């Protein structure tokens, strides 16, 4: 079986595709998989690192900021060039099925596959369906979703509740606690907080955590902070307090398996895949929805969890005042940590990648 997986721009669209690809290869090593993404975006490095070939398209997303709205004038040209290029890719590769994981990067691929009468499966991660998937839904044979009620956006006869696919290491329950601490140079027996700003970073979160370094040291809490590449150089140049040896600042975490193994508490943006990965890793979490996303969809992802006592919510504008106190309070409350883990785990289906892979096999 030949499969094209297309989508990207952020980790939330890239990592589900990799998780699905991994299961398809496990099911049959003869399966051939090709990724198609947006040139210059993170998928162009992350997909090859996972062992799969990828082709980049010259596609660009819509710029919604008024002062940059003029940049959208060239968008039709990039779309046409991408459609022409992806038509050649499909003709040469001859896929049996095309999978779309969302984001503008997948739009030309899915649209052209539909025009060429190739079966299509879409995977929607969020509680609020993305623009690309809503536009492409009419071409899809099946639409795999993670939240109930998604027939509000898609034809109900196409919707399949599978959950969000997560990378395989998150379902591996091997005891990596001590190796993970050694990897990051941290001490055992101390509360470890993993802070993730999302694949594109989050400056307000990073700055609040760094400015509280002396507070964490006082409370014997160690921190792993992933700033994102965009903010790492800014943080390096800023005049922040000196950090103790148990404060690790990284632009990007290559070994997320070890980061989750080390963590007692996770602070994260509320992207759908981030939430699913934290649930699979069985960690108590504080979520800070990004205000810079379409239709405030990260808030929509996390609100159902808050109502079920499965997550702690802090709004982005509350970060300077509320984030550090919330971390300190949760670090002291073992019972609440256990409750959050149990409730979050119960909110999501497991083995989503396996379910989607089986659906793809049945479709072909």
Swiss-Prot record:
UDP-N-acetyl-alpha-D-glucosamine binds at residues 10-12, 126, 167, 199, 253, 298. It is an enzyme of class 2 (transferase). Belongs to the glycosyltransferase 28 family. MurG subfamily. This is UDP-N-acetylglucosamine--N-acetylmuramyl-(pentapeptide) pyrophosphoryl-undecaprenol N-acetylglucosamine transferase. InterPro entries: GlcNAc_MurG, Glyco_trans_28_C, GlycoTrans_28_N. It comes from the Bacteria. Pathway: Cell wall biogenesis; peptidoglycan biosynthesis. It catalyses: di-trans,octa-cis-undecaprenyl diphospho-N-acetyl-alpha-D-muramoyl-L-alanyl-D-glutamyl-meso-2,6-diaminopimeloyl-D-alanyl-D-alanine + UDP-N-acetyl-alpha-D-glucosamine = di-trans,octa-cis-undecaprenyl diphospho-[N-acetyl-alpha-D-glucosaminyl-(1->4)]-N-acetyl-alpha-D-muramoyl-L-alanyl-D-glutamyl-meso-2,6-diaminopimeloyl-D-alanyl-D-alanine + UDP + H(+). One of its GO terms (cellular component) is plasma membrane. It is found in: Cell inner membrane. It is a peripheral membrane protein. Its main location: membrane. Cell wall formation. Catalyzes the transfer of a GlcNAc subunit on undecaprenyl-pyrophosphoryl-MurNAc-pentapeptide (lipid intermediate I) to form undecaprenyl-pyrophosphoryl-MurNAc-(pentapeptide)GlcNAc (lipid intermediate II). GO terms for biological process: carbohydrate metabolic process; cell division; cell wall organization; lipid glycosylation; peptidoglycan biosynthetic process; regulation of cell shape. Keywords: Cell cycle, Cell division, Cell inner membrane, Cell membrane, Cell shape, Cell wall biogenesis/degradation, Glycosyltransferase, Membrane, Peptidoglycan synthesis, Transferase. Its EC number is 2.4.1.227. The gene is murG. GO terms for molecular function: UDP-N-acetyl-D-glucosamine:N-acetylmuramoyl-L-alanyl-D-glutamyl-meso-2,6-diaminopimelyl-D-alanyl-D-alanine-diphosphoundecaprenol 4-beta-N-acetylglucosaminlytransferase activity; undecaprenyldiphospho-muramoylpentapeptide beta-N-acetylglucosaminyltransferase activity.
